[in-house]
Structure formats: structure tokens, C-alpha cells
């Protein structure tokens, strides 16, 4: 994999459009003609452009990631819930960020804080320990 990342400016130049237009096409925002969308997408493909989702999430103050904290990922129930949740949220355009905390309150809190710092759109809990609780300060 090349260390020379293709920039949005290069995509815009290749497609013959503005950087703003490329950004709008990539974000599915605004009213862009089908021909322009096709040109931008062709340039993205031709140049191998990969959108930096972390940067886009910072700009939009949103995330396409949902966190799921489990007690034990090897538990059949947890595995089934994970599979079902993953399938459902992917249909909504989200991806799953999975963490396992066991019975440790400290690890549970660490998982929640890590997910929050990563900017997840939400956090779900499944089969966490009965004594685990979230202390929000």
C-alpha cells in the first residue's frame, strides 16, 4: 500500500470540479447533478481515494459507529446479539465497535470512556455484570 495518500483536492482537479463539490458528493449532501456525481465517483475510483472518516466525523460532529460492550464475547447469547445488532445497524449505515469487559468495573468504565473518546454515535450494553454500573461525572 502506498504511503502517498490521494487528497480531495487531487480528486477535484481530476474530476474538473471544486473541492466543495467533491465533499458534497462524498457526503451525499446538496443537489448535485447525476453527471457530476458520476465524474467525481469515477475520479475517486481511478485515483484510489479513501475518505478519512475520522476527519469527516470531526467536521460533522457525528459518527457512523455504534459501540457494544459485552461481558463475554464467547458467550453464545452475546454472540447472537452481536450478530443481530451488527446486521441491523449496517443496514442503517453504521458499523459496530465491539469491546469486552468481563466482570471488571474498571474495564467496563474504560470501555465506555474509550468509546466516548472515539466519538461513537451511541453505546449499547449486553450481559454486563450485575454489579457493574456507569458513573457519569
From Swiss-Prot:
Keywords: DNA-binding, Repressor, Transcription, Transcription regulation. Residues 8-27 bind DNA. It comes from the Bacteria. The keyword Repressor applies. GO terms for molecular function: DNA-binding transcription factor activity; transcription cis-regulatory region binding. Gene3D superfamilies: 3.40.50.2300, lambda repressor-like DNA-binding domains. Residues 6-60 form the HTH lacI-type domain. Repressor for the malX and malY genes. This is Maltose regulon regulatory protein MalI. It comes from Vibrio furnissii.
